[in-house]
């Protein structure tokens, strides 16, 4: 079986490094990265990741908008999307689900919970 591909999207290089480190240390998944919603859309369409983990607050296009746009395109419509942010208020979480995300986690990310969430969406 080919290695699963995860698209990690965050404008923070530190957050990307941390998420990538968790994934690569504990799985055989291949990590792709993007630093904003526009790059995320381009990579999601060209690389066909198995799942997208995306920050909400980013320059150029935020995670809510990128999620909505991914749901509009045939090629990216069915890709599971997990939104990540420091804000955990109920209204903010609801806005994430209304944008089309499958799940929502808050920072700081717990490595074990993050891996379990990824594996649950990837059927492992």
Where does each model-flagged region fall?
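Two-component/phosphorelay signaling modules centered on CheY-like receiver
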Residues: 13-32
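Receiver (REC) domain active-site loop signature in two-component systems and cognate sites
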Residues: 58
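Short, conserved "switch-loop" micro-motifs in signal-transduction and mechanochemical regulators
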Residues: 87-88
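C-terminal output helix
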Residues: 109-118
């Amino acid at each position: 079986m080919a290695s699963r591909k995860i698209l990690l999207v965050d404008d923070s290089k530190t957050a990307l490094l941390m998420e990538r480190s968790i994934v690569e240390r504990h799985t055989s998944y291949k990590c792709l990265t993007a630093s904003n919603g526009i790059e995320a859309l381009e990579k999601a369409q060209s690389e066909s990741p198995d799942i997208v983990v995306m920050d909400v607050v980013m320059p150029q296009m935020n995670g809510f908008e990128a999620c909505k746009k991914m749901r509009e395109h045939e090629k990216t419509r069915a890709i599971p999307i997990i939104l990540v942010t420091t804000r955990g208020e109920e209204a903010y979480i609801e806005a994430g689900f209304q944008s089309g995300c499958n799940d929502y986690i808050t920072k700081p990310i717990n490595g074990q919970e993050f891996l379990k969430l990824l594996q649950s969406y990837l059927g492992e």
